[in-house]
Protein backbone atom coordinates (compact mmCIF):
# COMPACT_ATOMS: atom_id res chain seq x y z
CA UNK A 1 0.00 0.00 0.00
CA UNK A 2 1.41 3.39 -1.08
CA UNK A 3 0.89 6.65 0.76
CA UNK A 4 0.74 9.91 -1.17
CA UNK A 5 1.79 13.18 0.41
CA UNK A 6 0.00 16.22 -0.94
CA UNK A 7 2.25 19.26 -0.84
CA UNK A 8 0.44 22.16 0.81
CA UNK A 9 0.12 25.30 -1.27
CA UNK A 10 2.02 28.22 0.21
CA UNK A 11 -0.27 30.76 1.83
CA UNK A 12 -0.36 34.51 1.44
CA UNK A 13 1.15 36.29 4.45
CA UNK A 14 0.35 39.87 5.42
CA UNK A 15 3.43 39.84 7.60
CA UNK A 16 5.63 38.93 4.64
CA UNK A 17 4.02 41.72 2.59
CA UNK A 18 4.60 44.16 5.43
CA UNK A 19 8.31 43.38 5.62
CA UNK A 20 8.65 43.67 1.84
CA UNK A 21 6.95 47.07 1.87
CA UNK A 22 9.06 48.25 4.78
CA UNK A 23 12.23 47.15 3.01
CA UNK A 24 11.54 49.00 -0.23
CA UNK A 25 10.00 52.03 1.48
CA UNK A 26 13.02 52.39 3.75
CA UNK A 27 15.33 53.51 0.95
CA UNK A 28 13.22 56.54 0.00
CA UNK A 29 10.68 57.33 2.68
CA UNK A 30 13.20 57.62 5.52
CA UNK A 31 14.73 60.74 3.95
CA UNK A 32 11.33 62.21 3.10
CA UNK A 33 10.17 61.61 6.68
CA UNK A 34 13.28 63.35 8.03
CA UNK A 35 12.63 66.32 5.74
CA UNK A 36 9.02 66.53 6.87
CA UNK A 37 9.77 66.13 10.58
CA UNK A 38 12.50 68.77 10.40
CA UNK A 39 9.93 71.17 8.96
CA UNK A 40 11.79 71.75 5.70
CA UNK A 41 8.98 70.60 3.41
CA UNK A 42 5.47 69.17 3.32
CA UNK A 43 4.02 65.68 2.93
CA UNK A 44 4.10 65.37 -0.87
CA UNK A 45 7.56 63.82 -0.81
CA UNK A 46 6.45 61.15 1.69
CA UNK A 47 3.36 60.36 -0.37
CA UNK A 48 5.22 60.01 -3.67
CA UNK A 49 8.10 58.04 -2.16
CA UNK A 50 5.64 55.51 -0.69
CA UNK A 51 3.74 55.17 -3.94
CA UNK A 52 6.61 54.83 -6.39
CA UNK A 53 8.80 52.69 -4.13
CA UNK A 54 5.92 50.20 -4.25
CA UNK A 55 6.76 49.46 -7.89
CA UNK A 56 9.58 47.21 -6.66
CA UNK A 57 6.96 44.82 -5.29
CA UNK A 58 6.11 43.72 -8.84
CA UNK A 59 9.09 41.35 -9.36
CA UNK A 60 8.66 40.15 -5.76
CA UNK A 61 5.03 39.22 -6.49
CA UNK A 62 5.89 37.56 -9.80
CA UNK A 63 8.82 35.50 -8.47
CA UNK A 64 8.14 34.99 -4.74
CA UNK A 65 10.66 32.18 -4.24
CA UNK A 66 13.49 34.45 -5.41
CA UNK A 67 12.58 37.37 -3.14
CA UNK A 68 15.96 37.44 -1.36
CA UNK A 69 17.93 37.54 -4.63
CA UNK A 70 15.61 40.09 -6.24
CA UNK A 71 15.59 42.29 -3.15
CA UNK A 72 19.38 42.10 -2.84
CA UNK A 73 20.00 43.15 -6.45
CA UNK A 74 17.43 45.95 -6.36
CA UNK A 75 18.47 46.85 -2.82
CA UNK A 76 22.09 47.52 -3.79
CA UNK A 77 20.93 50.08 -6.35
CA UNK A 78 18.42 51.64 -3.96
CA UNK A 79 20.97 51.65 -1.14
CA UNK A 80 23.61 53.48 -3.19
CA UNK A 81 21.18 56.07 -4.59
CA UNK A 82 19.35 56.71 -1.34
CA UNK A 83 22.51 56.86 0.76
CA UNK A 84 23.99 59.47 -1.58
CA UNK A 85 20.79 61.51 -1.33
CA UNK A 86 20.68 61.15 2.46
CA UNK A 87 24.29 62.24 2.85
CA UNK A 88 23.71 65.18 0.53
CA UNK A 89 20.81 66.28 2.72
CA UNK A 90 22.84 65.86 5.92
CA UNK A 91 25.69 67.96 4.51
CA UNK A 92 23.81 70.65 2.61
CA UNK A 93 20.31 70.60 4.09
CA UNK A 94 18.82 70.21 0.61
CA UNK A 95 17.24 67.44 -1.43
CA UNK A 96 19.04 66.10 -4.46
CA UNK A 97 17.51 67.51 -7.66
CA UNK A 98 18.23 68.38 -11.27
CA UNK A 99 19.54 71.72 -9.98
CA UNK A 100 22.30 69.82 -8.16
CA UNK A 101 23.23 68.07 -11.41
CA UNK A 102 23.37 71.43 -13.17
CA UNK A 103 25.69 72.89 -10.56
CA UNK A 104 27.83 69.73 -10.50
CA UNK A 105 28.27 69.66 -14.27
CA UNK A 106 29.02 73.39 -14.31
CA UNK A 107 31.60 73.06 -11.52
CA UNK A 108 35.35 73.01 -12.19
CA UNK A 109 37.62 70.18 -11.00
CA UNK A 110 38.81 71.94 -7.83
CA UNK A 111 35.29 72.83 -6.76
CA UNK A 112 34.13 69.29 -7.53
CA UNK A 113 36.86 67.77 -5.35
CA UNK A 114 35.92 70.14 -2.51
CA UNK A 115 32.30 69.11 -3.00
CA UNK A 116 33.09 65.38 -2.85
CA UNK A 117 35.43 65.79 0.11
CA UNK A 118 32.42 66.78 2.21
CA UNK A 119 31.26 63.16 1.97
CA UNK A 120 34.37 61.82 3.71
CA UNK A 121 33.89 62.75 7.33
CA UNK A 122 33.43 60.65 10.47
CA UNK A 123 29.82 61.81 10.78
CA UNK A 124 28.97 60.66 7.25
CA UNK A 125 30.80 57.34 7.72
CA UNK A 126 28.82 56.61 10.89
CA UNK A 127 25.54 57.52 9.17
CA UNK A 128 26.43 55.27 6.22
CA UNK A 129 27.26 52.34 8.51
CA UNK A 130 24.05 52.71 10.52
CA UNK A 131 21.99 53.11 7.36
CA UNK A 132 23.55 50.01 5.81
CA UNK A 133 23.00 47.98 8.97
CA UNK A 134 19.28 48.79 9.02
CA UNK A 135 18.97 47.92 5.32
CA UNK A 136 20.66 44.54 5.86
CA UNK A 137 18.50 43.83 8.91
CA UNK A 138 15.34 44.50 6.91
CA UNK A 139 16.63 42.27 4.10
CA UNK A 140 17.10 39.37 6.53
CA UNK A 141 13.42 39.64 7.54
CA UNK A 142 12.15 39.16 3.99
CA UNK A 143 10.00 36.11 3.25
CA UNK A 144 8.20 35.07 0.04
CA UNK A 145 4.97 36.96 -0.63
CA UNK A 146 2.76 34.31 -2.21
CA UNK A 147 -0.20 35.53 -4.24
CA UNK A 148 -2.10 32.75 -6.05
CA UNK A 149 -2.01 32.65 -9.83
CA UNK A 150 -3.42 34.48 -11.77
CA UNK A 151 -3.94 37.14 -9.06
CA UNK A 152 -0.23 37.85 -8.78
CA UNK A 153 -0.32 39.02 -12.42
CA UNK A 154 -3.47 41.06 -11.84
CA UNK A 155 -2.02 42.77 -8.76
CA UNK A 156 1.30 43.44 -10.50
CA UNK A 157 -0.42 44.95 -13.52
CA UNK A 158 -2.69 47.01 -11.25
CA UNK A 159 0.38 48.52 -9.58
CA UNK A 160 2.03 49.28 -12.90
CA UNK A 161 -1.17 50.67 -14.39
CA UNK A 162 -2.14 52.79 -11.40
CA UNK A 163 1.25 54.41 -10.95
CA UNK A 164 2.61 54.62 -14.51
CA UNK A 165 0.25 53.68 -17.32
CA UNK A 166 -2.91 55.41 -16.04
CA UNK A 167 -1.33 58.88 -15.67
CA UNK A 168 0.21 58.54 -19.13
CA UNK A 169 -3.08 57.41 -20.71
CA UNK A 170 -5.17 60.07 -18.95
CA UNK A 171 -2.89 62.99 -19.76
CA UNK A 172 -1.97 61.93 -23.29
CA UNK A 173 -5.20 60.49 -24.68
CA UNK A 174 -7.97 61.99 -22.52
CA UNK A 175 -6.58 65.43 -21.64
CA UNK A 176 -4.60 65.65 -24.91
CA UNK A 177 -1.45 66.91 -23.23
CA UNK A 178 1.87 66.58 -25.10
CA UNK A 179 3.59 63.28 -24.32
CA UNK A 180 6.74 65.13 -23.29
CA UNK A 181 4.80 67.16 -20.72
CA UNK A 182 3.20 63.97 -19.41
CA UNK A 183 6.62 62.42 -18.90
CA UNK A 184 7.83 65.60 -17.18
CA UNK A 185 4.91 65.48 -14.76
CA UNK A 186 5.44 61.78 -14.06
CA UNK A 187 9.18 62.29 -13.57
CA UNK A 188 8.47 65.06 -11.09
CA UNK A 189 6.19 62.75 -9.08
CA UNK A 190 8.74 59.93 -9.10
CA UNK A 191 11.66 62.13 -8.06
CA UNK A 192 11.41 61.59 -4.26
CA UNK A 193 11.83 57.81 -4.66
CA UNK A 194 15.21 56.11 -5.06
CA UNK A 195 16.78 55.74 -7.56
CA UNK A 196 14.38 57.83 -9.59
CA UNK A 197 15.70 61.08 -8.11
CA UNK A 198 18.90 60.50 -10.09
CA UNK A 199 17.28 59.16 -13.26
CA UNK A 200 14.47 61.71 -13.44
CA UNK A 201 16.82 64.42 -12.23
CA UNK A 202 19.16 63.70 -15.14
CA UNK A 203 16.26 63.48 -17.59
CA UNK A 204 14.88 66.84 -16.43
CA UNK A 205 18.37 68.34 -16.43
CA UNK A 206 18.90 67.32 -20.07
CA UNK A 207 15.48 68.67 -21.05
CA UNK A 208 16.13 72.05 -19.45
CA UNK A 209 19.71 72.18 -20.68
CA UNK A 210 18.55 71.82 -24.28
CA UNK A 211 16.09 74.67 -23.83
CA UNK A 212 18.69 76.72 -21.97
CA UNK A 213 21.31 76.23 -24.68
CA UNK A 214 18.88 77.27 -27.41
CA UNK A 215 17.90 80.48 -25.60
CA UNK A 216 21.51 81.34 -24.77
CA UNK A 217 22.61 80.82 -28.37
CA UNK A 218 19.83 83.12 -29.53
CA UNK A 219 20.87 85.74 -26.98
CA UNK A 220 24.54 85.50 -27.97
CA UNK A 221 23.59 86.15 -31.58
CA UNK A 222 21.90 89.49 -30.78
CA UNK A 223 23.71 92.61 -32.05
CA UNK A 224 24.97 95.06 -29.39
CA UNK A 225 23.17 98.31 -28.65
CA UNK A 226 23.93 100.98 -31.26
CA UNK A 227 25.58 104.35 -30.49
CA UNK A 228 26.37 103.11 -27.01
CA UNK A 229 27.96 105.58 -24.57
CA UNK A 230 28.95 105.33 -20.92
CA UNK A 231 29.03 108.85 -19.51
CA UNK A 232 29.53 107.86 -15.86
CA UNK A 233 33.27 108.47 -15.81
CA UNK A 234 36.30 106.20 -15.60
CA UNK A 235 36.49 105.64 -11.85
CA UNK A 236 36.14 102.05 -10.57
CA UNK A 237 32.58 101.37 -9.51
CA UNK A 238 30.23 98.65 -8.27
CA UNK A 239 26.53 98.61 -9.09
CA UNK A 240 24.14 96.25 -7.30
CA UNK A 241 20.68 95.08 -8.31
CA UNK A 242 18.74 93.15 -5.66
CA UNK A 243 15.61 91.35 -6.86
CA UNK A 244 13.11 90.38 -4.18
CA UNK A 245 10.24 87.91 -4.41
CA UNK A 246 6.51 88.12 -3.57
CA UNK A 247 6.97 91.13 -1.28
CA UNK A 248 4.21 93.71 -1.37
CA UNK A 249 5.01 97.08 0.09
CA UNK A 250 1.65 97.34 1.87
CA UNK A 251 2.92 94.89 4.50
CA UNK A 252 6.15 96.80 5.18
CA UNK A 253 6.33 99.30 8.04
CA UNK A 254 8.69 101.23 5.78
CA UNK A 255 5.58 102.05 3.75
CA UNK A 256 3.24 102.73 6.67
CA UNK A 257 2.08 99.26 7.73
CA UNK A 258 1.29 99.42 11.47
CA UNK A 259 3.19 96.23 12.35
CA UNK A 260 6.94 96.73 12.56
CA UNK A 261 7.94 94.35 9.78
CA UNK A 262 10.94 96.33 8.46
CA UNK A 263 12.76 97.71 11.53
CA UNK A 264 16.23 97.65 9.96
CA UNK A 265 15.18 99.41 6.77
CA UNK A 266 13.12 101.85 8.84
CA UNK A 267 16.24 102.75 10.82
CA UNK A 268 18.35 103.10 7.67
CA UNK A 269 15.75 105.37 6.10
CA UNK A 270 15.77 107.64 9.15
CA UNK A 271 19.55 107.84 9.49
CA UNK A 272 20.92 107.56 5.95
CA UNK A 273 19.90 110.34 3.53
CA UNK A 274 21.31 108.31 0.64
CA UNK A 275 18.50 105.73 0.93
CA UNK A 276 15.57 106.77 -1.26
CA UNK A 277 12.20 105.02 -0.91
CA UNK A 278 9.93 105.19 -3.97
CA UNK A 279 6.26 105.07 -3.00
CA UNK A 280 4.36 104.38 -6.21
CA UNK A 281 6.05 101.63 -8.22
CA UNK A 282 4.01 98.64 -9.38
CA UNK A 283 4.87 95.49 -11.26
CA UNK A 284 3.21 94.62 -14.57
CA UNK A 285 2.96 90.85 -14.09
CA UNK A 286 2.39 88.98 -10.79
CA UNK A 287 4.75 86.13 -11.75
CA UNK A 288 8.54 86.01 -11.48
CA UNK A 289 9.55 84.82 -14.95
CA UNK A 290 7.04 86.98 -16.77
CA UNK A 291 7.99 90.22 -15.01
CA UNK A 292 11.74 89.66 -15.25
CA UNK A 293 11.34 89.09 -18.99
CA UNK A 294 10.24 92.74 -18.96
CA UNK A 295 12.15 94.34 -16.06
CA UNK A 296 15.55 92.99 -17.17
CA UNK A 297 15.00 93.73 -20.86
CA UNK A 298 13.34 96.21 -23.21
CA UNK A 299 10.09 94.24 -23.26
CA UNK A 300 6.93 95.62 -21.68
CA UNK A 301 3.20 94.91 -21.69
CA UNK A 302 2.76 96.33 -25.19
CA UNK A 303 5.89 94.65 -26.57
CA UNK A 304 6.25 91.45 -24.54
CA UNK A 305 8.58 89.59 -26.92
CA UNK A 306 11.41 92.12 -27.09
CA UNK A 307 13.34 90.08 -24.53
CA UNK A 308 13.98 87.62 -27.36
CA UNK A 309 15.17 90.14 -29.95
CA UNK A 310 16.99 92.87 -28.01
CA UNK A 311 19.86 92.78 -25.50
CA UNK A 312 19.13 92.37 -21.81
CA UNK A 313 20.32 94.53 -18.93
CA UNK A 314 23.09 91.98 -18.36
CA UNK A 315 24.18 92.18 -22.01
CA UNK A 316 24.09 95.97 -21.80
CA UNK A 317 26.32 96.11 -18.72
CA UNK A 318 28.84 93.73 -20.28
CA UNK A 319 28.88 95.98 -23.34
CA UNK A 320 29.75 98.84 -20.95
CA UNK A 321 32.76 96.87 -19.72
CA UNK A 322 31.39 95.59 -16.42
CA UNK A 323 32.30 92.23 -14.96
CA UNK A 324 28.93 90.76 -14.10
CA UNK A 325 27.85 88.44 -11.28
CA UNK A 326 24.60 86.64 -10.48
CA UNK A 327 23.94 85.37 -6.95
CA UNK A 328 20.65 83.54 -6.53
CA UNK A 329 18.75 81.78 -3.78
CA UNK A 330 16.07 80.72 -6.26
CA UNK A 331 15.90 77.22 -7.72
CA UNK A 332 18.21 76.76 -10.66
CA UNK A 333 17.22 74.13 -13.22
CA UNK A 334 13.49 73.53 -13.31
CA UNK A 335 11.06 73.75 -16.21
CA UNK A 336 9.61 76.89 -14.68
CA UNK A 337 12.96 78.52 -13.91
CA UNK A 338 14.82 77.90 -17.17
CA UNK A 339 14.50 81.57 -18.14
CA UNK A 340 16.01 82.61 -14.81
CA UNK A 341 18.98 80.38 -15.53
CA UNK A 342 19.26 81.91 -19.01
CA UNK A 343 19.42 85.38 -17.45
CA UNK A 344 21.99 84.23 -14.91
CA UNK A 345 24.16 82.65 -17.61
CA UNK A 346 24.30 86.00 -19.38
CA UNK A 347 26.63 87.11 -16.57
CA UNK A 348 30.31 86.24 -16.15
CA UNK A 349 30.06 84.33 -12.88
CA UNK A 350 27.13 82.68 -11.11
CA UNK A 351 26.50 81.55 -7.55
CA UNK A 352 23.60 79.10 -7.28
CA UNK A 353 22.76 78.79 -3.59
CA UNK A 354 19.51 76.79 -3.76
CA UNK A 355 19.39 73.24 -5.15
CA UNK A 356 16.12 72.26 -3.48
CA UNK A 357 13.81 69.95 -5.40
CA UNK A 358 10.82 72.17 -4.64
CA UNK A 359 10.36 75.87 -3.93
CA UNK A 360 8.18 74.93 -0.95
CA UNK A 361 11.17 74.02 1.21
CA UNK A 362 13.14 75.87 3.86
CA UNK A 363 15.91 77.89 2.26
CA UNK A 364 16.98 81.17 3.83
CA UNK A 365 18.14 84.23 1.93
CA UNK A 366 21.08 84.71 4.27
CA UNK A 367 22.64 82.18 1.85
CA UNK A 368 23.49 85.09 -0.46
CA UNK A 369 25.43 87.18 2.07
CA UNK A 370 28.71 85.25 1.99
CA UNK A 371 29.05 85.15 -1.83
CA UNK A 372 27.97 88.81 -1.95
CA UNK A 373 30.83 89.75 0.38
CA UNK A 374 33.18 87.62 -1.72
CA UNK A 375 32.17 89.32 -4.97
CA UNK A 376 32.53 92.78 -3.42
CA UNK A 377 36.23 91.97 -2.99
CA UNK A 378 36.69 91.03 -6.65
CA UNK A 379 39.38 93.33 -8.14
CA UNK A 380 37.47 94.07 -11.36
CA UNK A 381 37.29 97.88 -11.79
CA UNK A 382 33.67 97.83 -12.95
CA UNK A 383 31.29 95.32 -11.39
CA UNK A 384 27.58 94.58 -11.69
CA UNK A 385 26.23 92.31 -8.96
CA UNK A 386 22.71 90.91 -9.30
CA UNK A 387 21.28 89.23 -6.20
CA UNK A 388 18.04 87.26 -6.57
CA UNK A 389 16.26 86.46 -3.32
CA UNK A 390 13.50 84.03 -2.39
CA UNK A 391 12.08 86.90 -0.38
CA UNK A 392 8.61 86.17 0.96
CA UNK A 393 7.71 83.41 -1.49
CA UNK A 394 5.03 80.95 -0.37
CA UNK A 395 5.24 78.92 1.86
CA UNK A 396 5.96 81.94 3.97
CA UNK A 397 6.94 79.97 7.09
CA UNK A 398 9.80 78.39 5.14
CA UNK A 399 11.42 81.79 4.53
CA UNK A 400 12.60 82.37 8.09
CA UNK A 401 13.96 80.22 10.95
CA UNK A 402 11.29 78.60 13.08
CA UNK A 403 12.45 80.46 16.20
CA UNK A 404 11.96 83.86 14.56
CA UNK A 405 8.17 83.93 14.32
CA UNK A 406 7.71 87.32 15.99
CA UNK A 407 4.07 87.63 14.92
CA UNK A 408 2.97 84.05 15.66
CA UNK A 409 -0.50 84.11 17.24
CA UNK A 410 -0.72 87.91 16.97
CA UNK A 411 -4.22 89.28 16.26
CA UNK A 412 -3.32 92.96 16.26
CA UNK A 413 -3.87 94.81 12.95
CA UNK A 414 -5.41 91.68 11.38
CA UNK A 415 -8.30 91.89 8.88
CA UNK A 416 -11.67 90.78 10.28
CA UNK A 417 -13.06 87.30 9.76
CA UNK A 418 -9.86 85.29 9.34
CA UNK A 419 -10.05 81.69 10.52
CA UNK A 420 -7.17 80.05 12.39
CA UNK A 421 -5.43 78.79 9.24
CA UNK A 422 -5.74 82.16 7.49
CA UNK A 423 -4.47 83.99 10.57
CA UNK A 424 -1.44 81.71 10.69
CA UNK A 425 -0.68 82.42 7.03
CA UNK A 426 -1.19 86.16 7.56
CA UNK A 427 1.29 86.18 10.45
CA UNK A 428 3.74 83.92 8.61
CA UNK A 429 3.84 86.46 5.78
CA UNK A 430 4.70 89.27 8.21
CA UNK A 431 7.41 87.08 9.76
CA UNK A 432 8.81 86.47 6.27
CA UNK A 433 8.80 90.23 5.64
CA UNK A 434 10.69 90.76 8.89
CA UNK A 435 13.39 88.29 7.83
CA UNK A 436 13.51 89.77 4.33
CA UNK A 437 14.06 93.17 5.94
CA UNK A 438 17.14 91.80 7.69
CA UNK A 439 18.55 90.34 4.46
CA UNK A 440 18.01 93.46 2.34
CA UNK A 441 19.35 95.75 5.08
CA UNK A 442 22.38 93.45 5.46
CA UNK A 443 23.12 93.69 1.74
CA UNK A 444 22.97 97.49 1.90
CA UNK A 445 25.17 97.59 5.03
CA UNK A 446 27.71 95.13 3.59
CA UNK A 447 27.87 97.17 0.40
CA UNK A 448 28.19 100.43 2.34
CA UNK A 449 30.99 98.98 4.50
CA UNK A 450 33.26 98.68 1.44
CA UNK A 451 33.14 102.47 0.91
CA UNK A 452 32.00 101.86 -2.67
CA UNK A 453 31.59 104.09 -5.66
CA UNK A 454 28.18 103.06 -6.94
CA UNK A 455 24.56 102.43 -6.08
CA UNK A 456 22.17 99.65 -5.09
CA UNK A 457 18.61 99.17 -6.33
CA UNK A 458 16.17 96.84 -4.58
CA UNK A 459 12.71 95.88 -5.78
CA UNK A 460 10.40 92.91 -5.48
CA UNK A 461 9.40 91.13 -8.67
CA UNK A 462 5.72 91.26 -7.69
CA UNK A 463 3.49 91.60 -4.66
CA UNK A 464 1.24 89.10 -2.91
CA UNK A 465 -2.37 89.12 -1.76
CA UNK A 466 -2.51 87.72 1.77
CA UNK A 467 -6.11 88.39 2.87
CA UNK A 468 -5.54 92.15 2.51
CA UNK A 469 -8.45 92.97 0.20
CA UNK A 470 -12.10 92.60 1.29
CA UNK A 471 -13.69 90.12 1.78
CA UNK A 472 -10.26 88.94 2.99
CA UNK A 473 -10.47 85.44 1.51
CA UNK A 474 -7.85 85.66 -1.26
CA UNK A 475 -4.29 84.49 -0.84
CA UNK A 476 -1.64 84.36 -3.56
CA UNK A 477 -1.73 85.84 -7.05
CA UNK A 478 -4.21 85.51 -9.90
CA UNK A 479 -3.79 87.64 -13.01
CA UNK A 480 -7.39 87.00 -14.01
CA UNK A 481 -8.69 88.26 -10.67
CA UNK A 482 -6.21 90.99 -9.74
CA UNK A 483 -5.96 93.04 -6.56
CA UNK A 484 -3.66 95.97 -5.90
CA UNK A 485 -1.58 94.02 -3.40
CA UNK A 486 -0.52 91.57 -6.11
CA UNK A 487 1.22 94.44 -7.92
CA UNK A 488 2.39 96.95 -5.28
CA UNK A 489 6.11 96.49 -4.69
CA UNK A 490 8.92 98.14 -2.74
CA UNK A 491 11.46 100.07 -4.79
CA UNK A 492 14.56 101.38 -2.99
CA UNK A 493 17.69 103.17 -4.17
CA UNK A 494 20.84 103.56 -2.10
CA UNK A 495 23.67 105.70 -3.48
CA UNK A 496 27.17 105.84 -2.01
CA UNK A 497 28.85 109.07 -0.92
CA UNK A 498 31.47 108.71 -3.65
CA UNK A 499 28.86 108.15 -6.35
CA UNK A 500 26.74 111.03 -5.09
CA UNK A 501 29.79 113.32 -5.12
CA UNK A 502 30.49 112.69 -8.81
CA UNK A 503 26.85 112.17 -9.86
CA UNK A 504 24.91 114.61 -7.64
CA UNK A 505 21.16 114.11 -7.92
CA UNK A 506 18.18 114.92 -5.75
CA UNK A 507 15.58 112.15 -5.91
CA UNK A 508 13.18 113.69 -3.37
CA UNK A 509 10.90 115.00 -6.12
CA UNK A 510 10.76 111.59 -7.82
CA UNK A 511 9.56 109.32 -5.01
CA UNK A 512 5.81 109.68 -5.62
CA UNK A 513 5.88 109.29 -9.40
CA UNK A 514 3.64 106.56 -10.81
CA UNK A 515 5.95 104.01 -12.36
CA UNK A 516 5.87 100.49 -13.79
CA UNK A 517 8.68 98.02 -13.16
CA UNK A 518 8.38 96.99 -16.81
CA UNK A 519 10.38 100.13 -17.68
CA UNK A 520 13.23 99.43 -15.24
CA UNK A 521 15.97 99.17 -17.86
CA UNK A 522 15.53 102.87 -18.71
CA UNK A 523 15.82 103.92 -15.05
CA UNK A 524 18.85 101.67 -14.61
CA UNK A 525 20.50 103.08 -17.74
CA UNK A 526 19.85 106.61 -16.48
CA UNK A 527 21.37 105.89 -13.07
CA UNK A 528 24.40 104.16 -14.62
CA UNK A 529 25.01 106.98 -17.10
CA UNK A 530 24.36 104.88 -20.20
CA UNK A 531 22.82 106.09 -23.44
CA UNK A 532 22.17 104.31 -26.74
CA UNK A 533 19.64 104.01 -29.52
CA UNK A 534 16.42 103.00 -27.79
CA UNK A 535 17.11 104.63 -24.43
CA UNK A 536 14.11 106.76 -23.46
CA UNK A 537 14.58 109.26 -20.60
CA UNK A 538 10.81 109.77 -20.39
CA UNK A 539 10.62 106.18 -19.11
CA UNK A 540 13.17 106.69 -16.32
CA UNK A 541 11.55 107.45 -12.97
CA UNK A 542 14.58 109.53 -11.88
CA UNK A 543 14.85 111.67 -15.01
CA UNK A 544 13.60 115.28 -15.26
CA UNK A 545 12.00 114.35 -18.60
CA UNK A 546 9.95 111.53 -17.04
CA UNK A 547 6.34 111.24 -18.21
CA UNK A 548 3.70 109.24 -16.38
CA UNK A 549 1.94 106.75 -18.64
CA UNK A 550 -0.70 104.07 -18.17
CA UNK A 551 0.60 101.31 -15.95
CA UNK A 552 -0.66 98.26 -17.81
CA UNK A 553 -1.07 94.95 -16.01
CA UNK A 554 -2.33 91.58 -17.24
CA UNK A 555 -1.38 88.88 -19.72
CA UNK A 556 -0.17 90.58 -22.93
CA UNK A 557 -0.62 87.35 -24.88
CA UNK A 558 -4.32 87.18 -24.07
CA UNK A 559 -6.76 89.20 -26.16
CA UNK A 560 -8.09 92.31 -24.40
CA UNK A 561 -6.48 91.22 -21.12
CA UNK A 562 -4.50 94.38 -20.36
CA UNK A 563 -6.01 96.74 -17.81
CA UNK A 564 -4.91 99.96 -16.15
CA UNK A 565 -3.56 99.21 -12.67
CA UNK A 566 -4.91 102.51 -11.37
CA UNK A 567 -8.48 101.41 -12.11
CA UNK A 568 -8.27 98.57 -9.56
CA UNK A 569 -10.32 99.11 -6.38
CA UNK A 570 -8.43 99.83 -3.18
CA UNK A 571 -8.13 97.26 -0.41
CA UNK A 572 -8.13 98.15 3.25
CA UNK A 573 -5.92 101.15 3.94
CA UNK A 574 -3.41 99.19 5.99
CA UNK A 575 -0.43 100.24 3.91
CA UNK A 576 0.80 101.94 0.78
CA UNK A 577 -1.18 100.93 -2.36
Curated annotation (Swiss-Prot):
Transmembrane segments: 17-37, 44-64, 69-89, 119-139, 154-174
Subcellular location per the Swiss-Prot or TrEMBL entry: Cell inner membrane
Pathway participation: Bacterial outer membrane biogenesis; LPS core biosynthesis
Gene3D superfamilies: Alkaline Phosphatase, subunit A
InterPro entries on file: Alkaline_phosphatase_core_sf, EptC/CptA, PEA_transferase, Sulfatase_N
Enzyme Commission designation: 2.7.-.-
Keyword Transferase among record annotations: yes
One GO CC annotation: plasma membrane
Keyword flag tRNA-binding: no
Short name of any one Pfam family annotated for the protein: Sulfatase
GO molecular function: phosphotransferase activity, phosphate group as acceptor
Membrane topology field: Multi-pass membrane protein
Role description: Catalyzes the addition of a phosphoethanolamine moiety to the outer membrane lipopolysaccharide core. Plays a role in the pathogenesis of E.coli meningitis. Required for invasion of E.coli K1 into brain microvascular endothelial cells (BMEC). Contributes to E.coli traversal across the blood-brain barrier.
Name of the protein in its database record: Phosphoethanolamine transferase EptC
Designated gene of the protein: eptC
Amino acid sequence: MHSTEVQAKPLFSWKALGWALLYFWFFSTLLQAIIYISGYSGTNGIRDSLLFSSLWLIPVFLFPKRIKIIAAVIGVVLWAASLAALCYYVIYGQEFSQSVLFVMFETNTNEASEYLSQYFSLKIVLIALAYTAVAVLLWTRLRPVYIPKPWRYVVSFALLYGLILHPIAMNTFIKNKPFEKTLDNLASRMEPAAPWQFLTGYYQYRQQLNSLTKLLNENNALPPLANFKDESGNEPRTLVLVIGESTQRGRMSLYGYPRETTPELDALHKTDPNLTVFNNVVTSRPYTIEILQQALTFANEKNPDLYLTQPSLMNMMKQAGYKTFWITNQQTMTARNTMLTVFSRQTDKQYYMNQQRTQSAREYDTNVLKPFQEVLKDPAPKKLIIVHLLGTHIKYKYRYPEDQGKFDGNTEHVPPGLNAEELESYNDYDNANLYNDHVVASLIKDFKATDPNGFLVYFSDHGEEVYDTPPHKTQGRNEDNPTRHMYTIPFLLWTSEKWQATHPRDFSQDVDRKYSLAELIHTWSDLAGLSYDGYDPTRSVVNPQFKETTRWIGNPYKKNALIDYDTLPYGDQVGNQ
